[in-house]
């Protein structure tokens, strides 16, 4: 009678694989494996930590004023290297690593170096946007509220 192949069967060196078994094609090379992301290596990591702490302290007030979710896509060489979400719409406010859990009202696509200049106050956000230094998707007018939050944080 017909015998069903054992799906748990092992292939030993030199054996030919059975019908339902697959061949191991070798292991991935070192360069093909993704490198662990070290957040502290990014220029702006300490800035995000400070802003997150500020939101924890005064988040409830900010939620009343802002009522929006912002997603910051930080890029380097045209590729997104980091995403942060500032949720000032739900609960007492939150800032977390990763894309927005709920649909973001405004998404900023900002190069790492430009974001540093924005936060430090070297360049005006509106002028930088009009000059094409970063992109905004969604409700562009809400970006002015985020600018105020950064200014309040910078005063601390």
Curated annotation (Swiss-Prot):
Pfam families linked to this entry: SCP2
Annotated SCP2 domain residues: 44-156
Originating organism: Mus musculus
InterPro entries: SCP2_sterol-bd_dom, SCP2_sterol-bd_dom_sf
Name of the protein: SCP2 sterol-binding domain-containing protein 1
PANTHER family: SCP2 STEROL-BINDING DOMAIN-CONTAINING PROTEIN 1 (PTHR10094:SF25), STEROL CARRIER PROTEIN 2 SCP-2 FAMILY PROTEIN (PTHR10094)
Gene3D superfamilies in alphabetical order: SCP2 sterol-binding domain
């Amino acid at each position: 009678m017909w015998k069903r192949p054992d799906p748990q069967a092992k292939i030993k060196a030199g054996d030919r694989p059975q019908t339902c078994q697959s061949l191991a094609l070798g292991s991935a090379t070192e360069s093909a494996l993704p490198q662990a992301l070290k957040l502290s290596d990014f220029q702006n990591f300490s800035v995000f930590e400070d802003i997150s702490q500020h939101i924890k302290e005064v988040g409830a007030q900010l939620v009343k004023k802002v009522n929006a979710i912002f997603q910051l896509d930080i890029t380097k060489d045209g590729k997104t290297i980091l995403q942060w979400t500032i949720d000032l719409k739900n609960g007492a406010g939150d800032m977390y690593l990763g894309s927005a859990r709920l649909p973001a009202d405004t998404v900023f696509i900002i190069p790492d170096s430009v974001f540093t200049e924005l936060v430090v106050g070297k360049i005006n956000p509106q002028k930088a946007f009009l000059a094409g230094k970063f992109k905004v998707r969604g409700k562009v007018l809400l970006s002015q509220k985020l600018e105020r939050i950064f200014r309040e944080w910078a005063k601390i």
